[in-house]
Amino acid sequence: TVGAILGSLLVSFWIIPSYGSSWAEKLLAVLAGVSAAVVMTAINQAKRRAARGSAEAPIHPSWALGVGVLAAAVLPSFPPVFLAHGRYIWWVNAQDRFPYVSEGAASTVAVHVGSDGYRNFHVSGRVEATDNPSDLRTERLIGHLSGLPHPHPESVLVVGMGGGISAGALSLYPEIKRIVICEIEPRVVGATRLFADKNYHVLDSPKVEVVFDDARHFLATTREKFDIITSDPIHPWVRGNSILFSKEYYSIVRDRLKPGGLATQWVPLYETSELAIKIQMKTFMGAFPNGTVWNTNVSGKGYDVVLVGGEQPLKIDLDDMDRRITQNQLIYDSLAEVKIHNAVELVNDYGASGPDMQAWLEGVPVNRDFSLKLEYISGLALNAGEADPIYAHMVAGHTFPNVVGNPMKVAELRRRLLGNVR
């Protein structure tokens, strides 16, 4: 029993993170040969004592050891494509590259460059970030939809490092003095650095502190409060992530916000079901009743949304947003790269608010720590392909947001939002 416990700990927390699963398999093959040789030696000795001079030749233990060594020698290395793509391995072409592959104690991490030239960041076999235009837009907006609506943010907590693109967008705001990135897997850092041209070298910013910790543990134990907390874990059906979409998690997030603070949450509408999305919305809106939904898809159809919540209803000041966009060339360029050039174009991504969705969410349960139903409900719908109808139902009762600013800008925004002009 002691050996089994020590073996599992050594393999999980030292051998695989230090040398990889391929070397772990080879080592286990050799150890199996050694174990067999030890057992055979004991058996041979027992037979010799029992036979007392019998001419029967024992099987030499070196045969067992040799088989173990041979097995280790012929075992193929674990292909990077399996670590990166999981069930989506059929996406990979022969000319694709894997400039970074690493295995940690918490997850496997890989960067895959496809034939189209775009980089894909993978964690435990699932794409978590890319630099293709549609995903880059989402990743940037997680940052900018936090930074621009807040009138004077100074401190930020980013839950989940990913490609560092959301944190990088927030690092462009001169008023933000401190950014804490909480990441459970240290091996992610190597992958994040490969996105430096898109994340503005965020890991080298003097504003940034990287904390390697479980997000729930960090939030529960830190005394620090933040103006902005962004949460961008991977899909809730992925092992261990549903707990970052629970009522208790959002309660901790709310308690760690400074007065006037904002929390943002990425929610994918693909690889899930409408019931799962309703549970996510109901849970978030339980902590932030006046939360808002923002669609990051340039076409206005369903793909990803970002939730923004705070203690008070969100007030959108178009003039202040435009001032901050136009006076900071870095922020302007960051938004322009994802086809946004001013406040009206940004707020044109607005979808709905918590009160707008009350009828849609009526009777829906919430995700709790002691009943993580979301993990299983979303996992049953990986191939559902319901993103467009989910978003349409979500915003069916939408009303015009709380917007102030130049009357001409407000009128243009009203025409776009209520006239469904993208």
Label for each model-derived stretch:
Residues M40, A287, Q312-K315:
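Phosphate/oxyanion-binding loops and surfaces in catalytic or ligand/nucleic-acid-binding neighborhoods
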Residues R52-H150, S155-L157, D197-Y200, D214-R223, ...:
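Soluble small-group transferase modules, centered on the S-adenosyl donor enzyme superfamily
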Residues T1-R48:
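Membrane-embedded alpha-helical segments of integral membrane proteins
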Residues L28-L31, P174, I325, K339:
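A general structural motif at alpha-helix termini
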Residues D131-A287, V293, G300-G302:
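The AdoMet/dcAdoMet-binding core of the Class I SAM-like
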